[in-house]
Amino acid sequence: MLEFKIEELKLEDLKEAIKVIEDTFLKFEAPDYSKEGIENFFKFANYESIREKLNKNMKMYVAKISGKIVGVIGYRDNSHINLLFVLEEYQHNGIAKALYNLVIENCKNVATKKVTVNSSPYAHNVYLKFGFIDDNQMQEVDGIKFYPMHKEL
């Protein structure tokens, strides 16, 4: 099992976190998306957009190994996971689960009753393993494919 450390994202680490998101998205999710979907994903998942959201209602945590960011999770309003990415070479080592568990604990601590996610097709089985339930069939909005899901806490 890999040893990793989870910490709240610091602004000086945002560019590295964005790189993890970009690399993982392009490898595993972009092949299922239209050109429009890829463009719209990057309208959301870019430095300026995420920095602005961090100043409002979004929080992010990163997993680091020897100081290198290998995983990222983001959530907003203490109730909606909007990013969860782990670099390919570090997947299947418990990093996504550890990031997820931290967010769930944070949500429980503020009395959140339900957490939602719009899961990509690639991550759908991961969220099912985490105990999420599909709210609907796969949907596509602005070229972005997702499964709306929720989990009662």
Which residues fall in each region the model found?
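Conserved GNAT acetyl-CoA-binding A-motif
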Residues: C107-S120
